[in-house]
Regions:
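Composition-driven recognition of glycine/serine/threonine/acidic- and proline-rich low-complexity segments
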Residues: 1-155
Length: 155
């Protein structure tokens, strides 16, 4: 999969897929796609569907598969930026709720519960967040300006 992030306040990510490659996303993120992209919708099982409903996320996930070379574009739902992140062993990522935009099919999206009550009550993001694990490229939407910090172990 090759990609390019374009745009200003409401950016998009254009993904070029080879035959058989797949992308996952939650509802409402896809902007346009070539006719040879096939969409399937999955719930992920009753337990996962219940957990997603509890967290306020969509209970269903869309999977887009390329039947030959294809293109698909995903767009941000609010002003800000799109960031590409490589997910892999030791490179899992915890996101604020609703930050997940799209990912290659090898990336697993799940919910993450904060364990500290004070952080959940006063931290501004609540107790429920999103977790990306597995392996592949993921795209997250950042509301507002993106500032990056490189943290060391334990920070």
């Amino acid at each position: 999969m090759r990609y390019e992030i374009k745009g200003g306040s409401f950016p998009i990510v254009v993904c070029q897929l080879e035959s058989g490659e797949q992308m996952i996303t939650e509802k409402g993120s896809m902007v346009w796609m070539t006719p040879n992209m096939q969409m399937d919708t999955r719930g992920g099982g009753l337990g996962k569907m219940f957990a997603k409903a509890f967290s306020g996320e969509s209970m269903f996930q869309n999977i887009y598969a390329a039947r030959g070379q294809g293109m698909i574009t995903f767009g941000s739902s609010f002003p800000g930026q799109i960031k590409a992140v490589e997910i892999g062993p030791g490179r899992e990522m915890i996101l604020q709720k609703s930050a997940f935009l799209a990912a290659e099919a090898g990336v697993e999206l799940s919910i993450h519960f904060k364990k500290k009550i004070g952080v959940g009550l006063f931290g501004g993001e609540g107790f429920i967040m999103q977790k990306l694990s597995g392996r592949g490229m993921a795209f997250v939407e950042i509301d507002g300006e993106l500032v990056e910090y490189e943290l060391g172990p334990g920070e």
